[in-house]
Structure formats: structure tokens, C-alpha cells
A protein has these predicted regions:
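Amphipathic alpha-helical assembly/interaction segments
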Residues: 1-129
Length: 129
């Protein structure tokens, strides 16, 4: 199992993925995206709304799956996928704003959260070597 120490308490080894702050932030982001996309037009239910939800869910899911991999190399691969999902979701949030589905303030708030997760992911990749 990987020995990752990314948490507020640097002396504590993370044993389960649910203790990772990055995973916890990902879960919060999923909830935000679900609440936000609920307000989209009904004709987007199988379009942008569904795509954003799947993309958001993939962020903490890939963090969790990677954490359970035995080698850091595999873990890093899942974290790179997480970075891709973050970029994809940020693009979808911008599109939602351009289509007037969300307000500027909501867009900025979500983009800030996505970028925060991206930074945490990049730091974790570097820490894994």
C-alpha cells in the first residue's frame, strides 16, 4: 500500500482514502455540482447536467481507486486522470455560465474549488515522486 502523508497532521500516515483531505474536498465538490445542475433546464438532464455530474463523481472516485493501488506509479496515473477530470469539469462549468445556466458568482466559486483540488492533486503527485 502507498505510504501517503498528505493531511493536516503530517505525523499521521493515511490508512484509508476517506481520511485524505483531497478526497473529502472532492466529495464536497460532487455535492455542489449536483445542487448546481439541478437548476439546469430539463432538456439538459441527459446532456450537460449528466456529463458534469459524472465528471465530478470521477474526481474523488479516481483518488480513492488510485489510493488502493499497491504501487505509487499506479496511484499517480489515477491522480493524472483526476487532473484531467478537473479540467473537463472546469470547462463544463464555464460552458454552463456561457449558456446562462449559472451566474458569475456560482461559476467563480466552483472554479475556485476545482482549482484547489487540482493544486492538491499536483502536490500529491510530486510527493509520490
Amino acid at each position: 500500500m502507498t505510504n501517503v502523508e498528505i493531511n493536516a497532521n503530517k505525523n499521521r500516515k493515511i490508512k484509508i482514502f476517506k481520511d485524505l483531505r483531497i478526497w473529502q474536498e472532492g466529495i464536497k465538490l460532487v455535492k455542489d455540482i449536483y445542487l448546481l445542475s439541478k437548476k439546469f433546464p430539463k432538456d439538459e438532464i441527459y446532456g450537460l447536467s449528466s456529463q458534469m455530474r459524472r465528471c465530478a463523481v470521477s474526481i474523488p472516485s479516481n483518488i480513492a481507486e488510485g489510493f488502493r493501488r499497491y504501487h505509487n506509479k499506479e496511484y499517480k496515473q489515477f491522480l493524472y486522470i483526476t487532473l484531467g477530470s478537473c479540467a473537463e469539469l472546469e470547462t463544463q462549468v464555464i460552458i454552463s455560465h456561457e449558456l446562462d445556466y449559472i451566474k458569475e458568482e456560482a461559476k467563480e466559486e466552483i472554479v475556485e474549488k476545482i482549482q484547489y483540488i487540482c493544486k492538491m492533486t499536483s502536490r500529491l503527485i510530486k510527493k509520490l515522486g
